[in-house]
From Swiss-Prot:
This is 3-isopropylmalate dehydratase small subunit. The keyword Lyase applies. Disulfide bonds: none annotated. Belongs to the LeuD family. LeuD type 2 subfamily. The gene is leuD. The keyword Iron does not apply. The lineage of its organism: Bacteria, Bacillati, Bacillota, Bacillota incertae sedis, Caldicellulosiruptorales.
Length: 166
């Protein structure tokens, strides 16, 4: 799985209430959530982000309350992958469960600026800043977790496994 897009960079401790404000939790429609992704942080984010773009953030991304709405909103607005120095554990699990590819790599975050063209090879854990000609190495996910993300999330993965057994 290789993702390529423009970087949108933000800071440390972006919590789930900033990713998708609580006032929009009355819906679980991904398209509706996408319209409001990060709006309290960056009013223009949904207008700037293009399908395939990559979100880059600092430490503890996705902290705060556990809401699956946060990674759903990010994925639905077109972001292909999130690179952060670290993720809050509940966001980490929710992202994998809904099929949003995520990567932890401090060096990459430090070496990527907003607007840089970035390529992420999730299988091998290689992150390239194509704008600056730099390459970073992250720890790749175990194969079973890659398969969950490749399937589009845990539910789709389980459905596929059940079909194999049928």
């Amino acid at each position: 799985m290789i993702f390529k897009g423009k970087a949108h960079k933000y800071y440390d401790n972006i919590d789930t209430d900033v990713i998708i404000p609580a006032r929009y939790l009355n819906t679980s429609d991904p398209n509706e959530l996408a319209k409001h992704c990060l709006e309290d942080l960056d009013k223009e984010f949904v207008n700037k982000v293009q399908k395939g773009d990559i979100l880059v953030a600092g430490k503890n991304f996705g902290c705060g309350s556990s809401r699956e709405h946060a990674p759903i909103a990010i994925k639905a607005c077109g972001v292909s992958c999130v690179i952060a120095k670290s993720f809050a554990r509940i966001f980490y699990r929710n992202a994998i469960n809904i099929g949003l590819p995520i990567v932890e790599c401090e060096e990459a975050v430090d070496g990527i600026e907003a607007g840089d063209e970035v390529e992420v090879d999730l299988v091998n854990g290689i992150i390239k800043n194509l704008t600056k000609g730099k390459e970073f190495k992250a720890k790749p996910f175990p194969e079973f977790m890659q398969n969950i993300m490749k399937a589009g999330g845990l539910i789709e993965f389980v459905k596929g496994e059940l079909k194999k057994d049928a």
